[in-house]
Regions:
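Long, low-complexity, mixed-charge
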Residues: 1-77
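Extended amphipathic alpha-helical segments enriched in small hydrophobics
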Residues: 316-338
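Conserved beta-strand/loop scaffold segments within soluble protein domains that form the structured core
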Residues: 56-315, 319-322, 343-365
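A generic "cationic amphipathic patch" detector
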Residues: 2-36, 95, 130, 160, ...
């Protein structure tokens, strides 16, 4: 079983002294799959795959890179395959995780959306209440999700990472998107000590689409390392990556966003936008946007806003009786809420809203 991994490698390397080309992690061991709770609606089939996902998923590359695939193979933890039976699954698939403070687990999922079908999958990665102190939390939670979207299929994947018990979180996504298909990711990063996330969408089809809406709040010395890649191969393919987050209390964030236009992707459009709010002076914010072009007839855009709260706004809110810590919490919650509203499931919205309220009450947001 591998213990050392290199993940989130950039497709095109930048200066080595920046130490942003890849991330090295160690002490990675898994002992099996976490026992999930799955709600499978009509129109969706769930198949357990003890030997791993079908061969067709091997061609799908994840955002964390090949070392994650090696970890999955060596773990022999099996996989779960979700596939559409009909054209439309009106109710979302809900997959719940409740992690303990010391488990080391890996779960693998395959999502196969047949031609013209639509489905939503919600993964809520939470922690069980065990009463252990943060110093006693040694858990590793790792999840890999690979998707194949056939022509005109639509898949929305919502992932909520709020595992307070995890010392390390690994979350890997890879998707292959055919003609006219649409793949949407909604990510909420709410807790976890060291969280590593990779997401790659291969837009192989004409007019295929990938959107990612990401929100995070990081504090208490936590680390969030994110790598998103939109690989444009199909003509007139479209990608949109939007990130909005808050850093405070000696936290660190690395965001790598790549829009890669391959030869033949004429008419493709890729957009990337990041907004970061820094609430303390001791935080570390790193961002590396990449736009790679092997095709002339394309459009790629990147924009970033990084800053602190406006002094006039703070003065106004304080003059209305709000204390500075409450102002910070309000701003952090507002950014999460803006992305949470995009989740197509009222139950999920209510659960996360309740969690955020509890975290704010306990002073953790």
């Amino acid at each position: 079983m591998m213990e050392n991994m290199k993940i989130n490698q950039l497709p095109s390397k930048t200066w080595n002294w920046l130490k942003m080309n890849e991330t090295a992690i160690s002490g990675i061991t898994v002992s099996g799959a976490h026992e999930i709770k799955a709600e499978i609606p009509a129109g969706i089939s769930k198949t357990n795959c003890p030997a791993g996902l079908p061969d067709q998923f091997r061609e799908v590359a994840g955002g964390m890179g090949p070392d994650m695939d090696v970890l999955v193979r060596e773990s022999a933890a099996g996989a779960v395959l979700l596939s559409t039976d009909g054209d439309l699954a009106e109710t979302p698939v809900r997959i719940g995780f409740t992690y303990g403070a010391s488990e080391h687990s890996l779960n693998t999922f395959g999502i196969f959306a047949k031609e013209g079908s639509k489905m939503t999958v919600i993964m809520d990665m939470a922690a069980e209440a065990d009463g252990a102190s943060g110093a006693d939390h040694t858990a590793l939670s790792s999840v890999q999700t690979k998707l194949i979207l056939e022509k005109d299929a639509e898949v929305t994947l919502v992932q909520i990472i709020r595992n307070d018990n995890a010392k390390t979180v690994l979350n890997d996504i890879g998707a292959k998107v055919a003609d006219g298909a649409k793949f949407s990711v909604i990510h909420l990063f709410l807790s976890g000590d060291h969280v590593y996330n990779g997401c790659k969408a291969d837009l192989v089809g004409k007019k295929s689409t990938f959107t990612a809406d990401i929100a995070y709040t990081i504090g208490n010395d936590a680390v969030l390392d994110m790598n998103y890649v939109a690989l444009h191969e199909g003509k007139k393919s479209v990608s949109e990556i939007k990130t909005d987050g808050v850093l405070h209390e000696n936290s660190k964030k690395l965001f790598s966003g790549t829009i890669d236009f391959k030869k033949g992707a004429a008419g493709a459009v890729g957009n990337e936008k990041e907004d970061v709010l820094l609430l303390d002076d001791d935080v570390v914010n790193q961002t590396i946007p990449l736009i790679l072009c092997a095709e002339e007839d394309v459009e790629g855009n990147h924009g970033a806003t990084i800053g602190k709260l406006d002094d006039d706004m703070v003065f106004y809110l304080e003059s209305r009786g709000m204390e500075l810590p409450k102002i910070y919490k309000m701003m952090a919650k507002a950014r999460i809420d803006a992305v949470l509203r995009l989740a197509p499931d009222e139950k999920t919205k209510a659960d996360v809203a309740s969690y955020l309220e509890s975290e704010a009450t306990n002073g953790r947001i």
